[in-house]
């Protein structure tokens, strides 16, 4: 279920983080969560891996995002503004179990699980599931 109010807050946070207006800590501490809207959790947990949690910073200097990663953040903002339901299957981007599985030599299982996840839609436009949805969202901005 789309939580429009929380998505608007999340969208603005993603945009402000990209514009170097807020720090990683501000982004992390104020990003809204809602178990009834799986897009919020999926976007939060995916973006979490692209910034340093060890110290406070903005996305500039050595923390400047690569173009591909910047595109991911921009797609997330566009998705949050789209009003679309999140259609991807559940996937925990930051699960501690993956670290343990790698430690015990189960990397292939993790990779296979992720590859199955990616085939659920057009992964190049995640969090959109279809390229057409992404194009429509861009056209309406």
Predicted feature residues:
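Acidic, Ser/Pro/Thr-rich low-complexity regulatory regions
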Residues: 1-141
